[in-house]
Amino acid sequence: MLKKMSLGTVCLIFLSIFLTVQGFAQQKDNIGQIAIDTVRAHMGLPPGTEIKYVEKRESPVPGFYSVRLLLVTTDREIPVVVYVDKTGEKVFLGTLVVKGENVTRKEVGETKPRKVDPALLEMEKSPFRGPFQAKVTIVEFSNFHCSYCLKSWKGMKELLGRYPRDIKYVFKHFPLQSNGKARELSEMVAATQMVSNEAFWEVHDFFFSDEGQTLINGDRERLRLRIEVILKLKGFDVKAFQTALHTRYGKTRVEEDVAIGTKIGVGATPSGVINGDFVRGILPEKTIEKYLGK
């Protein structure tokens, strides 16, 4: 609905929802909570969205406050502005235009990726490629039964070859089922981490190859033997891998990665964290190059 109001010398156009809030009259100290409650009730937010209060300040509309909030979803931080009158009785949700200028857009700012504390990722426990102190650190949650993960890895491999000194890539196991073929293969590949970082990547690259993808649904024994052949041909310690399987080392690694991913909001693969910014889906080359300053 389009509403036009003339207040003194200020011409306002509200492309908005105009609401009368019951029961909040005279509660001036509760303006921020009124804004939060209104957004939660009327914006149709995705499940699990957190609403954070940022600030309250005078609005261009006489008698109203501009209340800035931050909507934290699984992958983004979305700033919004809610206009609440000083009695707490009236609320505007939407776009405020003053003399042809979109004031709301100016006040709100840009949507940003959701921030993730790097300490939560426990990167030191995971296999990686690239230098320790790289300009860009990428942590990706992935699994070998995911076609989008395969596509993401092919793009990532090209970028690692193009910028070998600038990108550190960390792999996290995230099979989408608690059991079954995907989980089983993830645990077996994770067991190679006990052998060495290099051993893991040999096996990782094989199962993300065209040949490896034809074998991922094979029985456990066949997969184990194939991994042992790869390790033996490359001169790695096969017994260390066998010990890792016996002690369920790979199972533990996968459980830890899944727990970390779940904690930070991973719900699908691939998902990643780039320099602390959460990204859902295939990591776009252009996005990564922006972090590189290219």
Predicted regions mapped to residue ranges:
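Cysteine-centric redox/oxidoreductase cores and disulfide-bonded domains
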Residues: Q26-D37, H42, R68, I78, ...
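Acidic/His-rich structured neighborhood in mature extracellular/periplasmic domains
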Residues: V108-S126, F144, Y148
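Bacterial N-terminal signal peptides
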Residues: T9-T20
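A short beta-strand-turn-helix
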Residues: P118-V136, G161
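C-type cytochrome heme c attachment motif
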Residues: T137, F144-K151, A190, D205, ...
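Typically the conserved alpha-helix immediately C-terminal to a functionally engaged Cys/Sec
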Residues: S142, Y148-Y163
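Short active-site neighborhood of thiol/selenol oxidoreductases, capturing the structured segment around
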Residues: P131-S147, Y169-H173
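N-terminal targeting signals for export/organelle localization
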Residues: L2-L7, V21-K115, K294
